[in-house]
Amino acid sequence: MTQKAKNTIYLLILIILSMLCLVYASVPLYSIFCKVTGYGGTVRTATVTQSKLGKTTIKIRFNADINKELPWKFYPEIPYTTVKPGEQKLIFYRAENLTNEYVSGMAVYNVTPYKVGKYFNKVACFCFTKQTLSPYQKTIMPVSFFIDPNIETDPETSDVKLITLSYTFFKYKETTK
């Protein structure tokens, strides 16, 4: 085999390995990108609320879905609320384990319209951690959030009057290494 053929094989192997590494890293990198930019309706997390209150009132609709593998009931206590940008709100979802076994779930979330994701900030949420319910247990799950007042000055979002906060609960599957 010539040196040129060997170099071509090495180059192809390097390209394939690079592509595999990129595929492996793409999900966490995309997740980080979405959290930083608010892209795709990804909500930001915050530890402190805004001190400035906005002028407009925005209606927040709450949605709850469950993957068919999770034997729970899951729903918001209220279907919607209103909030002024900068005002912190606390709302609750309810969950119930419908089985006689311990079951763990993990919630994923987003907001629509997607363009407001970067302005929707969660202070506290059940979605940050795995939730485990004992047999037939009912529980209340809090969500504390606020809308960044800058939503009013952004030409892309200044006309938004309705935001939907949506959760989907999935059965938590333990992974072994």
Curated annotation (Swiss-Prot):
GO terms for molecular function: copper ion binding. Its main location: membrane. The keyword Transferase does not apply. Residues 1-8 are cytoplasmic. GO terms for cellular component: plasma membrane. It is a single-pass type II membrane protein. It is found in: Cell inner membrane. Residues 30-177 are periplasmic. Gene3D superfamilies: Ctag/Cox11. It comes from the Bacteria. The chain crosses the membrane at residues 9-29. PANTHER family: CYTOCHROME C OXIDASE ASSEMBLY PROTEIN COX11, MITOCHONDRIAL-RELATED, CYTOCHROME C OXIDASE ASSEMBLY PROTEIN COX11-RELATED. This is Cytochrome c oxidase assembly protein CtaG. It comes from Ehrlichia ruminantium (strain Gardel).
